[in-house]
Amino acid sequence: MTIAIGKSSKEPKDLFDSMDDWLRRDRFVFVGWSGLLLFPCAYFALGGWFTGTTFVTSWYTHGLASSYLEGCNFLTAAVSTPANSLAHSLLLLWGPEAQGDFTRWCQLGGLWTFVALHGSFGLIGFMLRQFELARSVQLRPYNAIAFSGPISVFVSVSLIYPLGQAGWFFAPSFGVAAIFRFILFFQGFHNWTLNPFHMMGVAGVLGAALLCAIHGATVENTLFEDGDGANTFRAFNPTQSEETYSMVTANRFWSQIFGVAFSNKRWLHFFMLFVPVTGLWMSAIGVVGLALNLRAYDFVSQEIRAAEDPEFETFYTKNILLNEGIRAWMAAQDQPHENLVFPEEVLPRGNAL
């Protein structure tokens, strides 16, 4: 008989083992090795955002008021992108732009790069946290894989897109109204709504919402009645042996409604994972394309015919004209340093004019 003898528990642990024991200890809020990245980055990203929206103006970078101190509210406050002249500078506090002056750093837009970079690493840390915890309790890593969807969208929009453009100036500022303005910018300058990758993203997000509503309603509709047994539906009892709802009944119901239905829970839940995550990934790929100024679905034949025949118009040609109006108005507003001057006859007029 062979006897396996392990290390004596009395042997002193090295630094790595001691840290591993402390970080991965069972506690109310799991820390883990991923927490070394997640918690500091999330703290600094949120702290920078709250600081910027509360105190810091965007007058020097965008000519705008953007803080509570200046009279903005939650919907209009934002941490704005750096000035266009700063291009892709990391805007480090100790760098050549701010030279250690915190006030100047905030005025130049340093808080935006601070929030964007720490926010990106914080999101990645959160995904790694899901990997680490899943491995610790012997789960498969699909939660982390699903979370890669939002991460890919955030990184592509906030980092990769401005890297492909002239500077951080063209990234979205971090605020509600600021994001809306960025969406209008995407439409006017890239015709984003007609981009097939955006279409796949919309199909993924709205399709996922539909699947979620259908699934939740179906489970509620087919729940088995609670029994009085000690082993029946007691909240989070891990030893429950019965099914919670009737998959057979659900299958028969949707087979009658649609003619087709999911026949097993594995495929059903994988599909609910696949639809939104793939949609988000496709959107992220599309934004990377926009970073390189790739265009999609330019129906030039319709534009030429519309230019030649005043009576010919499609929804596409109307949208193209709308995009031209967005560009004419936004470019002059957003980039006053470019001294863009458009003839009066091409500028869009508001209702008051």
Curated annotation (Swiss-Prot):
Entry keyword annotation includes Ligase: no
Membrane topology: Multi-pass membrane protein
Chain positions recorded as pheophytin a binding sites: 130, 143
Principal cellular location given in the protein's record: plastid
Compartments it resides in: Plastid, Chloroplast thylakoid membrane
Record text on cofactor binding: The D1/D2 heterodimer binds P680, chlorophylls that are the primary electron donor of PSII, and subsequent electron acceptors. It shares a non-heme iron and each subunit binds pheophytin, quinone, additional chlorophylls, carotenoids and lipids. There is also a Cl(-1) ion associated with D1 and D2, which is required for oxygen evolution. The PSII complex binds additional chlorophylls, carotenoids and specific lipids.
Residues that bear Phosphothreonine: 2
EC number(s) on file: 1.10.3.9
Record-level GO cellular component terms: chloroplast thylakoid membrane; photosystem II
Entry binding sites for Fe cation: 215, 269
Function: Photosystem II (PSII) is a light-driven water:plastoquinone oxidoreductase that uses light energy to abstract electrons from H(2)O, generating O(2) and a proton gradient subsequently used for ATP formation. It consists of a core antenna complex that captures photons, and an electron transfer chain that converts photonic excitation into a charge separation. The D1/D2 (PsbA/PsbD) reaction center heterodimer binds P680, the primary electron donor of PSII as well as several subsequent electron acceptors. D2 is needed for assembly of a stable PSII complex.
Family: Belongs to the reaction center PufL/M/PsbA/D family.
Protein name, per record: Photosystem II D2 protein
Organism of this sequence: Angiopteris evecta
